[in-house]
């Protein structure tokens, strides 16, 4: 393979990688917003649950029954983590990290947007 073909292959790979990472960004943003909203709801519900004087007087399950906002938001947050939201909010970073691992063997790397970074060849003495 000559240098021109190699350069074209690298450009095509870079275009495809940046396209893939950029396609993940809107979904990642939505998952981050969902996680933020549910986390704030859970924190607000937890605060109301903790400052309620009845919480100390009744059983744990009765206390949860008396605070449905906290209970539902907490169950939703746990469900989101079981569904893998913690992976979805960092999906572009995971893809970039895996690409960096593979590209390191070829003295290359990439940034978080998928742009290739060519490293200088090591000089063998």
From Swiss-Prot:
Gene Ontology annotations for the cellular component aspect, listed alphabetically: cytoplasm; Nem1-Spo7 phosphatase complex; nuclear membrane
GO BP annotation list: lipid metabolic process; positive regulation of triglyceride biosynthetic process
Cellular location(s): Nucleus membrane; Cytoplasm
Superkingdom: Eukaryota
Keyword tags: Cytoplasm, Lipid metabolism, Membrane, Nucleus, Transmembrane, Transmembrane helix
Main location class: nucleus
Membrane topology: Multi-pass membrane protein
Residue ranges crossing the lipid bilayer per the database entry: 33-53, 65-85
Keyword Nucleus: yes
Keyword Ribonucleoprotein included in the entry's annotation: no
Entry's family note: Belongs to the CNEP1R1 family.
Functional summary from the UniProt entry: May form with the serine/threonine protein phosphatase ctdnep1 an active complex dephosphorylating and activating lipins. Lipins are phosphatidate phosphatases that catalyze the conversion of phosphatidic acid to diacylglycerol and control the metabolism of fatty acids at different levels. May indirectly modulate the lipid composition of nuclear and/or endoplasmic reticulum membranes and be required for proper nuclear membrane morphology and/or dynamics. May also indirectly regulate the production of lipid droplets and triacylglycerol.
Protein name: Nuclear envelope phosphatase-regulatory subunit 1
Species of origin: Xenopus tropicalis (Western clawed frog)
């Amino acid at each position: 393979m000559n240098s021109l073909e190699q350069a074209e292959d690298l450009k095509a790979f870079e275009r495809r990688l940046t396209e893939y990472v950029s396609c993940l960004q809107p979904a990642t943003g939505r998952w981050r917003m969902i996680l933020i909203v549910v986390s704030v709801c859970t924190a607000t519900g937890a605060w109301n649950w903790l400052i309620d004087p009845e919480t100390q007087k009744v059983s744990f399950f009765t206390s949860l029954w008396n605070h449905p906002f906290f209970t539902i938001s907490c169950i939703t947050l746990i469900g989101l983590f079981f569904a893998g939201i913690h992976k979805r909010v960092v999906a572009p970073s995971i893809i970039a990290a895996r690409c960096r691992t593979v590209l390191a063997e070829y003295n290359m790397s990439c940034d978080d947007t998928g742009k290739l970074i060519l490293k200088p060849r090591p000089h063998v003495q």
